[in-house]
Amino acid sequence: MKVVSVVGMAGAGKSEVAKIFEKNGFIRIRFGDVTDEEVSKRGLELNEENERSVREALRQEYGMSAYAILNLARIDLARKQSDVVIDGLYSWEEYTFLKTYYGEDFYVVAVWASPRTRYARLTDRSNRRLTLEEATNRDRAEMENINKGGPIAMADFTIINESSLKELKREVKGVISRLRGRD
């Protein structure tokens, strides 16, 4: 079974793409669930500052491949039943860990949108909304602290998400068809 990771900057549309994969038979695993669970376990409010703090603490404890390590059992269990889509791989180290572990069964789909488009989405979304300052700070932190650019650069497929949801669905279904043709 395939493991497909969706990567991109905040607001690019990673979760939308992962949901489209899910609707097409993939089991969706959201790496950020580990963060949410840890924030809750620590009795903290779920907000950007606390999420960033927990993400960085987990990476301090487990290394930069923390989220791949912490989600590996969930991925392996899901993979026994179906192809898997990962929503939220971030670091180069997570990428190399999963690429080494799954080899030819591991694929990366990058979702790209311009900063202007992403910031508009992030300041307008209903859950986990960010201010413009929080969005730009998150971009900087993710590029500087967690090596987010590498997995985007190494993607097997790239989707430009500057248009409509209808167009995004069309693009994603094309990628899914190409992946299924690789069996």
Task: Identify what each model region corresponds to.
Residues 1-4:
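Extreme N-terminal starter segment of soluble prokaryotic enzymes
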Residues 9, 21:
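P-loop (Walker A) phosphate-binding loop of NTP-binding proteins
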Residues 12:
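ATP-binding Walker
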Residues 15:
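Walker A/P-loop
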Residues 27-97, 128, 133:
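ATP-dependent small-molecule kinase phosphotransfer cores
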Residues 28, 108, 157-160:
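Short, well-ordered beta-strand core segments
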Residues 65, 124-178:
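Small-molecule kinase domains that catalyze NTP-dependent phosphoryl transfer to phosphate-bearing small molecules
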Residues 87-88, 101-126:
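Conserved phosphate-donor/acceptor-positioning beta-strand/loop module used by diverse small-molecule
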